[in-house]
């Protein structure tokens, strides 16, 4: 592996990139990869090492933002454990699948799907403000699980914008408002799904450990500050950031 010289400036830049990516992601309910991964590549890391470092950072989004959202009483622990434990096996399967089949052919299709969901969200203007959790029956739990499994597989396979899909699931299926949906996505996805991805790269020896303190510190601080701002600003602000992030993700997938 051709790792560039890890000077103090390089390590400082990785901290700043991790902070910015996780701050934005904590507001948008995802999208850290739109910022952090390209910056790590521009700094000269080989792709596999940049991806491993990105996964390490976003694995700590759930700890920083999740702690802040937990303090605010925004975590539904039933949904938290359901999201994490139901999705983890498919995240692992998606990660293994990625080594055998590229996701390039799927990206334009996923971009169109996300843009369609953005358009639907814009047409249904009141959904994001109403927090009226749906009473869950066994049939609804099974249906929600069937919807969640491909999202978890996608998170392990292609990864870009995975949080957008789960945020929509909370908004449209569980009938959460934007703040609660963002809190659940960042907490459950961050702690469970992203940590699994980070663990896979650690096991394979891809992680650049010299960058770990800066990446983790930036992720914890950025996600905590982002969650704090989101709680302060509320649903309307979070909805704008979420739809902006979703639109950018879709356009990048369509390239």
Which residue ranges define each predicted feature?
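Transmembrane helix exit motif
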Residues: 64-74, 111-136, 228, 248-255
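Selected transmembrane alpha-helices and immediately adjacent juxtamembrane segments
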Residues: 1-45, 132-182, 213
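Hydrophobic alpha-helical transmembrane segments in multi-pass integral membrane proteins
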Residues: 93, 148-158, 196-205, 249-255
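Selective hydrophobic functional segments
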Residues: 52-105, 109-112, 194-244
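Helix-coil boundary and interhelical linker segments in multi-pass alpha-helical membrane proteins
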Residues: 1-12, 41-49, 96-105, 202-210, ...
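Membrane-interface alpha-helices at helix entry/exit sites of multi-pass transporters
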Residues: 45-54, 78-79, 175-186
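Residues within membrane-spanning alpha-helices of integral membrane proteins
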Residues: 11, 55, 110-114, 118, ...
């Amino acid at each position: 592996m051709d790792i560039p010289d890890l000077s103090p400036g390089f390590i400082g830049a990785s901290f700043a990139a991790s902070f910015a990516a996780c701050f934005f992601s904590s507001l948008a309910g995802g999208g850290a990869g739109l910022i952090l991964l390209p910056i790590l590549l521009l700094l000269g890391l080989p792709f596999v090492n940049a991806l491993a470092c990105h996964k390490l950072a976003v694995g700590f989004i759930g700890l920083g933002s999740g702690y802040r959202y937990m303090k605010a009483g925004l975590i539904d622990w039933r949904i938290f454990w359901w999201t994490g434990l139901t999705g983890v096996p498919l995240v692992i399967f998606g990660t293994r699948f990625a080594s055998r089949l590229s996701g390039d052919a799927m990206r334009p299709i996923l971009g169109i799907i996300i843009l369609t969901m953005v358009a639907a969200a814009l047409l249904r203007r009141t959904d994001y403000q109403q927090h009226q959790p749906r009473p869950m029956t066994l049939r609804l739990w099974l249906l929600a699980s069937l919807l969640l499994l491909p999202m978890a597989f996608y998170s392990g396979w292609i990864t870009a914008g995975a949080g957008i899909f789960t945020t929509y699931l909370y908004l449209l299926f569980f009938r959460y408002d934007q703040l609660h949906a963002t809190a659940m996505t960042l907490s459950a996805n961050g702690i469970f799904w992203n940590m699994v991805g980070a663990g896979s790269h650690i096991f394979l020896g891809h992680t650049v450990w010299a960058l770990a303190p800066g990446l983790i510190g930036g992720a914890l601080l950025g996600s905590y500050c982002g969650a704090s701002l989101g709680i302060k600003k509320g649903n309307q602000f979070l909805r704008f950031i979420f739809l902006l992030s979703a639109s950018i993700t879709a356009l990048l997938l369509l390239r």
